[in-house]
Amino acid sequence: MNKMKKNVIASVAKQSFAALSIASLVFMTACGDDSSSGPSSTGDEPELSSSSNDDEGSSSSKKKGKSSSSVGEASSSSVEESSSSSEISVSLTGVVFGSDYSTGELRWIDKDGKISESSLSFHQDSKVVTNGADLYVLERKGADNITKIDPEKLESKGKKAVVWQVSLDDEANPVDMAFDGDQAWVALQNADSLVKISTEDGKVKKSIKIGKFAYEGEHSPYVADIELDDGSLYVLMQRYTQDENYVVTYPKGLLAIYDASTGDLKDTIQLKSKNPSNVAVIGGNVYVATHGEYNAAYGTDADSQRGIEKVNVSKKKSELLISGEDLGGGIASMVVDGEVVYVSINLGYDENYAAIQALKKVDISAKKVDDVEGFTDMSGSMAIDDGLLYVGDRSVPAVVTWNGKKKNTIKQPKGALPPYNIALF
């Protein structure tokens, strides 16, 4: 791999979750993010109002007329329908977001496991999140929007299923949401703050500054994931930095714990390893999955510098419970099903920059790791419900389910883009 390609990969790899495939990294760095594909309020769609946060903790810095903790005007772009919809509303199993790294689309999965023929267009780098009833599309760096959608109206109403859409500061890069009743915390990976918004209208209710946790010279600690449990908000920070030659430095990750109601900082805990990817609360205990540093092949080594950490909040300590030696490398993504977690292990990338990954099933309490055969690229994300695992396998490309014994490939509609993100209701 030549020096320019190495620089391109290193430049963007640190800006997103470790699970992103190198193909997307090359495209976004070389071409720039397309910010014109997000939804907006036009015609007879819901009208969106600008709003600001009057909370004392809100940011006072300004960028293009918006504070870094504010939700601004509706995006100037629009949702596009790829085909007409029927007039029958349906209950859904979940949604799948597809991307070819230049365009992105949202499709939905009905109770029979069929993916919709119709789709809505969004920014090519987006994440779908649900709270069990509503759907949210986080359009990431380059579009920087949050869109709430009524899933029951998707099939019958198409783009009119949009309830509201709000625009964030440029390059705020929303990456996750954690729901707290009729409000939700939003992680902004490239900003110096977290915001709490109303799920009714998207208006900011609270903002907390996190820039003090950034690595020296950086403005953001680069939040990778957030989790809300029993009144506490767990904020996972990667805290990397990059020099002018695109060389990335990863210090050990940091877990910050906030009061989910007030936004007050309760504690911080230094992790044992670097480049964390996911945080989860399992059986009252906090666990963190870490990817660690990349090796020369842009994969990860099977060593003790990465794995699954168990965090002892009361003692402010973290221990490496299951190492990369047991897993075969670093964790790109993790989903939880009771005491069992499924993790995708980053092994590297092929000559076409497609991810090469291994899928592992981990029994947390027994510290037992098992291989799940037949999956080679989970960079289209994973989701799980009642023991049924959904994998966005971009090597197929399709959404593939696994019930612990048998795989089933969900048929892709003609022209559907490869899976990039999955969320279940």
Language model: regions and residue ranges:
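Blade-level signature of beta-propeller repeat domains, shared across WD40, Kelch, NHL, RCC1
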Residues: 392-400, 404-425
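Beta-propeller blade signature
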Residues: 248-260, 302-313, 356-363
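Conserved beta-strand positions in repeat-built beta-propeller and related beta-rich domains
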Residues: 90-102, 137-142, 186-190, 235-244, ...
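Bacterial Sec-dependent N-terminal signal peptides
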Residues: 4-7, 20, 24-94, 262
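Asp-box/WD-like beta-propeller blade repeats and closely related beta-sheet repeat scaffolds
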Residues: 163-164, 168-181, 187-195, 199-227
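A short beta-strand motif characteristic of beta-propeller blades
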Residues: 112-120, 155-168, 203-216, 264-270, ...
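Loop/turn-rich, solvent-exposed surfaces of beta-rich toroidal or solenoidal domains
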Residues: 326-362, 369-393
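Repeated scaffold domains used in trafficking and secretory/extracellular systems
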Residues: 122-134, 171-181, 216-227, 271-283, ...
